């Protein structure tokens, strides 16, 4: 049943997206203007050592949500490293823990037999999701590589401008950065087939991955030349293209590389089939790009915003067999940092923060499936494993779910808790957002509410009810940060607050659990406040800030005490002005005075910039600090710090939040944008509204709202104190209510509405 309604939800999104993309001229003009900035260029060969990474990709990369590729070159060759997201070994041990670990699969190397010459050029083309190379050889060869969507074909199209045929060698190999895993190689009817196998002793499961390669368009020979390598040779003719087609198969936990199935598919491969695969890929990416976009007026900011969309859509989508970790589908070393895991104390959630407002919510589907897969083990741990969190919890047993920090998408935890209990509740915002941004009640009923209730069950049992003054309060003692042990850290209180707010809201919508609401309300009323202190580190502005726990812990890095702003959203632009000002003070103290926004390793991934936008923090500072980080991006346009990857896409949510926020179900246009022109197209807001607007630096010049579900649409008057009208797509004025600068009207699904300054005519 779950798969059935998930299919319906995704189908509805796809239909909506198709309708949304019918602005061909405007969209086409926008993307053509961005083609250059979304093309990364190398004009010299780059070696394996230059792109070798145990974290984010350092070279040209592409992905389809299941397969990842990273390239390196010589003047006459290209090697495409290949990984598969569900190729995971058991039994790997390092400082981070023992258990599951993601591995690379192998690669495909294409070499040109021609002396060195001028003209080497390599281009990673994000808009078309392909990587193009011209060899630096006297007989130049053009290689265009791409991945199919939903089917794991890696295709390289070869052509030459040489007047004579050019000899080509293709090597398909299995392996990674070590030789400790099993591998095989064979040929069958000139199809190369290699496999790699995970550890086989003292393990819970075994996985195999296969790479099978066929040459289309040229007579060829295939020979096994090593225990993990098959070599094809052929002549590339100037008259026609030749295709190197590799099908990646296997993965999972059933010790099966699925070579017979791969062989069967490649025996049928043809140039016509390849064209169809390319067309399917091009359509998918065109739709993905057209979902939404922004114009910030700053080429550096625009570049990282849009390249982040490319990174997200390459790493995760509805075709992913399992959810990738912090490094998406690019696990290209046998010793990936943190096992290439899903880090549950913010890192991996941060990779999905932007997909909702960016109108690509289905990209989060693999993550939901992973979390649901972990619930049974999480329930066992809450009952039986509390002492592993902290010795003081020995003998304690809770309902609900308890997650450690680390897991792999195949459905296995590994490693310690680092004394934290927020790793399951950290997913509450993500589950709520899919419903809030799409209006999908099936998702709310069958997926979001059950998970959020598990977190509520845990908190009901874990919180301590204690006397406080003339009343009582519900306190929490937990690790607010990794390996700390804190009384009432705001980082965790915000998740408690959000969890019970959502349970009250959603239980009313679904008409369930009425008998539990009194307890939930009581907890909300009696939660401790956030500790306020004067800064203890210099320099500072001498203004009050939020501490990290009730004892007044002041560590100027990682603004975890502002989870209330984001991702929990229990503090917003409508909150008490004094509380909001203290939040801004905290951001300035940690982020500017103490240089945290750019000097701390991952404040971007930690959503500090989103927190700034949600608090109304100085937008010029936010933009300047983001640009400082973006300016340090690599040639492949990724910001890297040796540890993180996907969460750097929080630039997208930061910019979106500066341009559009849903504040207590009211749309605010450009709530934290500086006095300079900007625009956004089809950003998704809570309530299922797709919003487009243009700002000239002084006032909003246009606003269009499309309803994907029926309901009341509320927006803050963009022209405060002036009359407003709303017209539908036929120009008919709709009934509008206005109260204290908040305008509202009833929107119908599938209809668009223009918000206009009323001329009085």
What annotation goes with each model-predicted range?
Residues 20-341, 361-365, 371-382, 549, ...:
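Acidic/polar, glycine-enriched structural segments that form the non-catalytic walls/loops
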Residues 149-158, 688-714:
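Carbohydrate-binding surface patches
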Residues 166-174, 706-720:
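Surface-exposed beta-strand/loop patches in extracellular or lumenal glycoproteins
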Residues 253, 323, 327-342, 394-445, ...:
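The feature captures the catalytic groove of carbohydrate-active enzymes
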Residues 344-351, 356-377, 416-437, 441, ...:
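Active-site core of glycosidic bond-cleaving carbohydrate-active enzymes
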């Amino acid at each position: 049943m779950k798969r059935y309604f998930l299919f319906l939800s995704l189908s509805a999104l796809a239909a909506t997206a198709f309708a949304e993309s019918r602005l061909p001229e405007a969209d086409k003009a926008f993307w053509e203007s961005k083609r250059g900035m979304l093309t990364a260029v190398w004009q010299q060969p780059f070696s394996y050592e230059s792109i070798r990474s145990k974290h984010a990709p350092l070279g040209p990369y592409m992905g389809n949500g299941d397969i990842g590729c990273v390239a390196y070159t010589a003047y006459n060759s290209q090697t495409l490293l290949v990984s598969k997201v569900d190729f995971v070994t058991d039994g790997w041990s390092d400082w981070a823990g023992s258990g599951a670990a993601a591995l690379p699969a192998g690669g495909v190397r294409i070499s040109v037999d021609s002396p060195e010459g001028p003209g080497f050029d390599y281009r990673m083309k994000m808009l078309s999701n392909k990587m193009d190379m011209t060899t630096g050889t006297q007989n130049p060869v053009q290689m265009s590589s791409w991945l199919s969507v939903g089917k794991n074909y890696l295709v390289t199209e070869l052509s030459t401008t040489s007047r004579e045929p050019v000899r080509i060698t293709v090597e398909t190999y299995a392996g990674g950065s070590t030789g400790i895993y099993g591998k095989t190689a064979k040929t069958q009817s000139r199809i190369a087939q290699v496999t790699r196998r995970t550890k086989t002793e003292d393990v819970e499961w075994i996985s195999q991955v296969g790479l099978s390669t066929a040459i289309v368009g040229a007579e060829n020979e295939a020979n096994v030349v090593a225990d993990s390598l098959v070599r094809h040779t052929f002549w590339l003719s100037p008259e026609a293209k030749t295709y190197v087609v590799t099908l990646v198969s296997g993965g999972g936990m059933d010790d099966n590389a699925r070579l017979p199935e791969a062989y069967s598919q490649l025996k049928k491969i043809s140039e016509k089939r390849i064209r169809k695969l390319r067309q399917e890929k091009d359509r998918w990416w065109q739709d993905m790009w057209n979902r939404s976009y922004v114009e910030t007026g700053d080429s550096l900011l625009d570049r990282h915003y849009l390249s982040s969309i490319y990174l997200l859509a390459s790493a995760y989508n509805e075709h992913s067999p399992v959810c990738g970790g912090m490094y998406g589908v690019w696990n290209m070393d046998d010793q990936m940092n943190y096992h290439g895991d899903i880090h549950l104390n913010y890192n991996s959630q941060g990779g999905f923060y932007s997909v909702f407002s960016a109108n690509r919510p289905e990209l989060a589907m693999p993550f939901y499936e992973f979390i649901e897969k972990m619930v049974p083990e999480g329930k066992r741990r809450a009952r039986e494993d509390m002492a592993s969190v902290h010795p003081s919890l020995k003998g304690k047993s809770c309902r609900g779910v308890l997650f450690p920090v680390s897991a792999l998408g195949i459905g296995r935890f590994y490693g310690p808790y680092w004394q934290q209990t927020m790793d399951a509740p950290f997913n509450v915002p993500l589950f709520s957002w899919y419903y809030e941004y799409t209006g999908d009640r099936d998702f709310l009923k069958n997926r979001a509410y059950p998970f959020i209730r598990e977190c509520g069950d845990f908190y009901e049992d874990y919180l301590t009810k204690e006397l406080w003054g003339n009343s009582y309060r519900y306190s929490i003692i937990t690790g607010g940060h990794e390996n700390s042990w804190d009384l009432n850290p705001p980082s965790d209180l915000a998740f408690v607050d959000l969890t019970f707010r959502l349970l009250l809201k959603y239980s009313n919508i679904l008409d369930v659990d009425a008998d539990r609401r009194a307890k939930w309300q009581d907890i909300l009323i009696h939660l401790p406040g956030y500790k306020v202190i004067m800064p203890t580190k210099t320099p500072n502005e001498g203004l009050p800030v939020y501490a990290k726990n009730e004892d007044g812990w002041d560590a100027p890095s990682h603004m975890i005490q502002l989870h209330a702003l984001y991702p929990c959203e229990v503090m917003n632009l409508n909150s008490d002005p004094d509380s909001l000002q203290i939040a801004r003070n905290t951001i300035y103290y940690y982020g500017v005075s103490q240089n945290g926004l750019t000097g701390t390793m991952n404040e971007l991934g930690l959503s500090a910039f989103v927190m700034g936008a949600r608090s109304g923090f100085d937008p010029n500072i936010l933009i300047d600090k983001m640009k400082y980080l973006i300016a340090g991006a690599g040639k492949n346009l990724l910001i890297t710090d040796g540890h993180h990857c996907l969460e750097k896409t929080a630039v997208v949510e930061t910019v979106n939040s500066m341009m559009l926020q849903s504040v207590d179900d009211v749309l605010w246009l450009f709530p934290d944008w500086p006095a300079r022109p900007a625009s956004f197209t089809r950003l998704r807001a809570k309530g299922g509204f797709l919003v487009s607007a243009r700002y000239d630096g002084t006032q909003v010049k246009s606003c269009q709202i499309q309803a994907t579900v029926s309901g009341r649409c509320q927006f803050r008057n963009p022209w405060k104190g002036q009359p407003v009208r709303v017209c539908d797509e036929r120009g008919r004025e709709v009934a509008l209510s206005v109260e204290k600068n908040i305008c509202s009207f009833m929107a119908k699904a599938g209809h668009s509405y223009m918000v206009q300054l009323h001329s009085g005519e």
